[in-house]
Amino acid sequence: MAKTKAVIPGSFDPITYGHIDIIERSAGRFDELHICVLKNSNKTGTFNIDERMALIEESVKHLSNVEVHNYNGLLVDFCDKIGAQTIIRGLRAVSDFEYELRLTSMNKKLNSNVETMYMMTSTNYSFISSSVVKEVAQYKADISDFVPPNVEKALKEKFKK
């Protein structure tokens, strides 16, 4: 039987416990889970792609079926390249759905063989976003409930002044 492969795309700038929640829950449902770090042209990154990948790899090293990649192109092309049939998208709130629906519709039009599945973030992480974590970190507040220790350390270094 063919291995089931899924992709979780995102900018992960930086990875948060909300992301990790979706990754851990997805890892148990697929033979291979591929984290794809994409450049978001609408956002200026705090961490470069290599830094983000290193932070993710450290944060998910306990998951043996998870691989971290970066890709500069269309997500559906990446799915084709690795043979993934499924894209996993995390939703924090209903407000995320409209944007995600547009992405899903475009991806489906570009490649009808790839399905998108939505997973609700666990309630205790539903308010966390990378942007909010970075904003709080800039003010030297405690972010240990929102990100793994390696990410907390990296953010403190970025915002040290």
Swiss-Prot record:
For ATP, which residues are the binding ones?
S11, F12, H19, G90, L91, R92, E100, Y125, S126, F127, I128, S129, S130, S131
Instruction: Please give the biological process terms from Gene Ontology that the record holds.
Output: coenzyme A biosynthetic process
> Which pathway does it serve?
Cofactor biosynthesis; coenzyme A biosynthesis; CoA from (R)-pantothenate: step 4/5
Q: Where is this site: Transition state stabilizer?
A: H19
Reactions listed under catalytic activity: (R)-4'-phosphopantetheine + ATP + H(+) = 3'-dephospho-CoA + diphosphate
Q: Name one GO cellular component term.
A: cytoplasm
Entries under SUPFAM superfamilies matching the protein: Nucleotidylyl transferase
Where substrate is bound, by residue? S11, K43, L75, R89
Where it mainly occurs, coarsely classed, is cytoplasm
List, alphabetically, the InterPro entries matched.
Answer: Cyt_trans-like (IPR004821), PPAT (IPR001980), Rossmann-like_a/b/a_fold (IPR014729)
Cofactor(s) needed: Mg(2+)
> One Pfam annotation, family name?
CTP_transf_like
Record key words, sorted? ATP-binding, Coenzyme A biosynthesis, Cytoplasm, Magnesium, Nucleotide-binding, Nucleotidyltransferase, Transferase
Q: Does the keyword Glycosyltransferase apply?
A: no
GO MF term list: ATP binding; pantetheine-phosphate adenylyltransferase activity
The record's EC number reads 2.7.7.3
Location of this chain's protein in the cell? Cytoplasm
According to the lineage, what is the superkingdom?
Bacteria
Which family does the UniProt entry place this protein in?
Belongs to the bacterial CoaD family.
Q: What does this protein do?
A: Reversibly transfers an adenylyl group from ATP to 4'-phosphopantetheine, yielding dephospho-CoA (dPCoA) and pyrophosphate.
Could you describe the subunit structure of this protein? Homohexamer.
HAMAP family, per the entry: PPAT_bact
Q: Which NCBIfam families match?
A: coaD_prev_kdtB, cyt_tran_rel
- What PANTHER family does the record tag this protein with? PHOSPHOPANTETHEINE ADENYLYLTRANSFERASE
Name of the protein in its database record: Phosphopantetheine adenylyltransferase
The source organism is: Staphylococcus haemolyticus (strain JCSC1435)
